[in-house]
């Protein structure tokens, strides 16, 4: 089972322009094996909000994609963060600090035994 990061989910937005390796991997991996994190959902939401402010027409397209495609596709498979996740995340910063959101996503994957 896999935890998808923002870049993989974003790649699915335009199926006709999706990288062929991503397409092949997604086609051979059943959707029931794909999870994501609340941190990824926050990053996607932040991107949509930014686009809605910058370019309302494109923002509306992204909003529809997020609400009508992504959220339903991951219904029941958006993993939360909790105190256990926080402990795992903190350990990922020692001895060297790591990017915050990436650390939360990695900690979530580790907590749930996902790749």
Where are these regions (language model features)?
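Short, well-structured N-terminal submotif of metal-dependent ribonuclease cores
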Residues: 1-40, 50-67
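Alpha-helix N-cap/helix-start and coil->helix boundary motif
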Residues: 9, 41-45, 86
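Active-site neighborhoods of divalent-metal-dependent phosphate/nucleic-acid chemistry enzymes
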Residues: 46-49, 60, 71-115
């Amino acid at each position: 089972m896999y935890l998808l990061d923002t870049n993989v989910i974003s790649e699915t937005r335009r199926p006709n322009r999706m990288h062929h390796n991503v397409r092949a991997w997604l086609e051979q991996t059943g959707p029931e094996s794909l999870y994501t994190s609340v941190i990824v959902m926050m990053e996607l939401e932040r991107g949509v909000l930014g686009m809605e402010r910058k370019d309302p027409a494109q923002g509306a397209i992204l909003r529809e994609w997020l609400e009508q495609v992504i959220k339903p596709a991951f219904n029941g498979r958006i993993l939360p963060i909790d105190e256990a996740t926080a402990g795992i995340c903190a350990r990922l910063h020692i001895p060297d600090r790591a990017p915050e959101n990436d650390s939360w996503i990695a900690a979530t994957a580790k907590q749930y035994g996902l790749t």
